[in-house]
Each structure stands twice: as C-alpha cells, then as structure tokens.
Amino acid sequence: MRRPLLGLLAALVVVGAIAGALAWLLNDPKPPTGANHAERLYYAYCVTCHGVDGRGSWRAALFLIRPGELPSAARSRPERYLFDIIKHGGAPLGRPGMPAFGYHLSDADIEALVVYLKTLDRRPAR
C-alpha cells in the first residue's frame, strides 16, 4: 500500500513541476507601467523573439533562431529599411526570415515602432 502512494506522490510532483515550468515559459513579459503606444506594440509583437532589450530572447534560441540585434541594426540602418523589414518581412544577411507584420500593423504603427527601435541602444540592458 505504501509503494503505490509513493508512486502517486512522485507523479504529482513531476506533473506540478512540468505545469510550473510551462506557466513560466508561457508568461509573456509585460510592458512597463506608463509605456507609450510604440513600446506597447514592441511588447505585443516583437519581444518574444527580440527580447525586452532588443538583443534576442531565449524563446527564439529554443528554436535555434538568432534574431537580429535591434539596437545596432536600428542605429546603422535607415528608417526606411527597418520599416520595410517590419512591414514585409525578410531574411537579411542569410538569416532565418522575419515574418511580415504589415497585415497586423498599420503604417503609422510601424513608423512608431521604428522610432522606438532607435531608442533601444540608449537603454540599459535588462
């Protein structure tokens, strides 16, 4: 009688650990309080792959994807290039392609995101 209870207890611990890990993995970062429209867009559409600071996220790494480092890309690329990559997607420098967001975001939203991306290199890494 004791052995089946021990097995059941062990199974419950394993299931609880897996559920806790999944809850942690699936918890998306939230924008800071008082975030402007562009920052909220970044958190809604970009942070999963590019991370909070724009330097990539562990979620993308799980799928062996290395998204571009946004602070240096935003600093070195023209705004039109960034706009086009966000709107139409693409595979710059032979990397896996970024999906197109032109169907989800208006041109004004994409322009606001581009302006926000230009501020990432001035933010401390988190």
Regions found by a protein language model. Give the residues of each.
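N-terminal Sec-pathway targeting helices
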Residues: 1-14
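Hydrophobic core
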Residues: 13-18, 54
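Electrostatic cytochrome c docking/interface patches
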Residues: 16-43
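Inter-heme linker and motif-flanking segments adjacent to c-type heme-binding CXXCH motifs
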Residues: 31-33, 55-56, 119-126
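The canonical Cys-X-X-Cys-His
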Residues: 38, 42-52, 98, 113-117
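Gly/Gly-Pro-rich "capping" loops immediately C-terminal to redox-active cysteine motifs
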Residues: 39, 51-84, 101-103
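Axial heme c-ligation environment in periplasmic c-type cytochrome domains
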Residues: 62-69, 88-120, 125-126
